[in-house]
Structure formats: structure tokens, C-alpha cells
From Swiss-Prot:
Source domain of life: Bacteria
Catalytic activities: L-glutamate = D-glutamate
Species of provenance: Streptococcus pyogenes serotype M3 (strain ATCC BAA-595 / MGAS315)
Name listed for the protein in its UniProt record: Glutamate racemase
Protein residues bound to substrate: D10, S11, Y42, G43, N74, T75, T184, H185
Similarity-based family: Belongs to the aspartate/glutamate racemases family.
Classification via Pfam families: Asp_Glu_race (PF01177)
Annotated InterPro entries: Asp/Glu/hydantoin_racemase, Asp/Glu_race, Asp/Glu_racemase_AS_2, Glu_race
Coiled-coil residues: none
Pathway(s) per entry: Cell wall biogenesis; peptidoglycan biosynthesis
NCBIfam families on file: glut_race (TIGR00067), PRK00865.1-3 (NF002035)
């Protein structure tokens, strides 16, 4: 038994979609979450800067005595995950491979779409992972740089959000049967995305898929938390306005949480 927390990092609030699924599947595990909303989005930034920011988040989580780090951010996974994984002596998990594997299982026509930040799409990481496992699958990737700002400003239900999603996804409509939400912010726009793509297109939440791998690693390294612990205290940190973060988090997690401000 290992009662240390699992650390989650993201460029902002998007990683809460992963946390929500973890709380549902593994309610006995403690969580420490750091969202770098003050510098979001990461997607348009240079690789060197993304690596620098990611390491700052990692080092912060290490001060919290975490037993595992989850990159709840596709951009950080694409740019820095392998480097961080090689450098640390605790498990480090990204969201890309679980999402890619789920897309392969889902597609019936071999036509998969991937949407993400400009950096995630430019890295081509999803296509590489998907075609490494299933070479015959065709992958269409599309950058959606306007999605993260919508979520970070808590405007997911606005009319402008609907128009932006509709216009952004137009190149993929009617051309795929599976769509990977290659940014953990995007599930917060899921109802609009599903409406635009149509009911026949299966949406893959890379973050939710990641939780299954977290469970496997906890078992493999024998670092599961206390199954009998009912009242688990989580900690949430943001580099931006705690009130905005708390508002979004409370809606998504369906519970009121305390959010602490941190300067990196």
C-alpha cells in the first residue's frame, strides 16, 4: 500500500477531464494537480519553452512527494514526456498512446481523425503511434488552436464556441468514423463536437483512456493506495486565477474543491 498522491500536470484546466475519470474509477487514490493556466495554451509555443514549462510543473509535483506523474496534456506529452520519463525513477504516463490504442479498436472503416493543439498536430505523434500499431489506418490530423482559450475562459456553452467548433471541424465532417480528442481540454466541448461530427462518429477521450493505464501501472509497481480509505483529500493548484479554475473544476468534477495559487 502506498498512500502518496498521484501527480497530474496540464497547461490549464483540461487535465481535469482525466482527474474526473480517475476519481470515478479509483476513488481511493489521492491527487495533486497543477494547471499552468497563466501560460496556457502551450500549443502555439516553441518546443524549448514547452519543455521548460513542463519541467517546472514536474519539479513542483516532485516537491509534493508524488508516486507517479501523469501528463494530462497532449502537447507536453508530445514534446517532453520521453525526456521526463527517462530522467525520473517514478512512473511517468502520457495520454497519447492510450488514445491511439483506443482509436484503433474503435474504427470500423480505418478512417481516424485527430484534433489537437498546433504543437501536438505538428509533432505527428498520434499518426505515428496509430500507424505503428495499425499501418492500414488512415489518419487525418487537424489543429484547433481556438478550442483551449474557449475552455480556459469558461465559455464552453456560448454561441461563439459553437461557431468556432463548427467552422474548425468542417474539414473532417463526413470523412472519418472515429475522432481522437487529442487535447484534454477538448472533452469539455464534447457535446458541441459530437453534434458537429454526427452521431455515427465515435469520439475518443485520450485522457479517460489513460486512467486504465494508470491502474495497470499502480498494480505493476505495487503502489496502490488504501482501498479502505473513504475520505480522500485532493489538492489542486493553478498559476492563474483560482476562482475561475474552481468554477470550471466544480462543474466538471461535480463537487466543490479548494484551489491554491502557486507561482512557478
Amino acid at each position: 500500500m502506498d498512500t502518496r498522491p498521484i501527480g497530474f500536470l496540464d497547461s490549464g484546466v483540461g487535465g481535469l477531464t482525466v482527474v474526473c475519470e480517475l476519481i470515478r474509477q479509483l476513488p481511493h487514490e489521492k491527487i495533486v494537480y497543477i494547471g499552468d493556466s497563466a501560460r496556457a495554451p502551450y500549443g502555439p509555443r516553441p518546443k524549448k519553452q514547452i519543455k521548460e514549462y513542463t519541467w517546472e510543473l514536474v519539479n513542483f509535483l516532485l516537491t509534493q512527494n508524488v508516486k507517479m506523474i501523469v501528463f494530462a496534456c497532449n502537447t507536453a506529452t508530445a514534446v517532453a514526456w520521453e525526456e521526463v520519463k527517462a530522467a525520473l525513477d517514478i512512473p511517468v504516463l502520457g495520454v497519447v498512446l492510450p488514445g491511439a490504442s483506443a482509436a484503433i479498436k474503435s474504427t470500423t472503416k480505418g478512417q481516424v481523425g485527430v484534433i489537437g493543439t498546433p504543437m501536438t498536430v505538428a509533432s505527428d505523434i498520434y499518426r505515428k503511434k496509430i500507424q505503428l500499431l495499425a499501418p492500414s489506418v488512415q489518419v487525418r490530423s487537424l489543429a484547433c488552436p481556438k478550442f483551449v482559450p474557449i475552455v480556459e475562459s469558461n465559455e464552453m456553452c456560448s454561441s461563439i464556441a459553437k461557431k468556432i467548433v463548427y467552422d474548425s471541424l468542417a474539414p473532417l465532417v463526413g470523412k472519418i468514423d472515429t475522432l481522437v480528442l487529442g487535447c484534454t481540454h477538448y472533452p469539455l466541448l464534447r457535446p458541441i463536437i459530437q453534434n458537429v461530427m454526427g452521431p455515427s462518429v465515435k469520439l475518443i477521450d485520450s485522457g479517460a483512456e489513460c486512467v486504465r493505464d494508470i491502474s495497470v501501472l499502480l498494480n505493476y509497481f505495487d503502489i496502490n493506495g488504501n482501498y479502505h480509505q473513504k475520505a480522500v483529500k485532493h489538492r489542486f493548484f493553478t498559476t492563474a486565477n483560482p476562482e475561475i479554475f474552481q468554477e470550471i473544476a466544480s462543474i466538471w468534477l461535480k463537487q466543490k474543491i479548494n484551489v491554491e495559487h502557486v507561482t512557478l
